């Protein structure tokens, strides 16, 4: 909270300095809350996605969820003149994610590493469609703001949509047992008396709403929903109910750490946080792919 271009010290806050207090409550606190909510929400979205798709390489950034949210945003801008129609963003995000989940469930890949590769191709197709529509209807400037995540412009009144991650995380925790059963397999879930398709749909709704809300406010945070759940599972096991709060905590810590790096690495200028996360996430993702290939 005390790292930034504008100087602010704890002494100024405690002494009641008007400018320091305004900066603290208008910019620094909202930015901190946005970082924590985005990190926790997107990490939980990745954890739930990996369960319902039965693949540890699945995540909002490798299944087309984020690209579908971007398509919904551009369509909202084109048809309604602004991107405030959240129902369209969430709806297209849910539809695209459900399509991908059904696709990978119907086709049994010989290796788990094919799922994220197919997901990235699917996401690229959606992104190409989105870019074409944005070019055609002069909405490219609105779209480009989403391509690079940055917390620098987060102010009070700009980030409150991220609070939707809180009830979504709670619902994920409440449905953890059912989602875990679905993650084992359809036959197992049905034998337990669960409505398999209903649980999958609920999981996709949770993933899409959390992912879309983060992307709309912050932008794309690549690989976050992939690496955090996998690292938590590696060190703490596969108990979904136990891993949900751990994943939320470590996701928030990771984004906070990357944000500090992005602020300090070229200080007093600021690097977009998506660049830092992309470098870190890309290295971890490649390591996971190589490890998965060795154990395939």
Please report, for each region that a protein language model flagged, where it lies by residue.
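Alpha-helical transmembrane segments in inner-membrane proteins
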Residues: 1-296
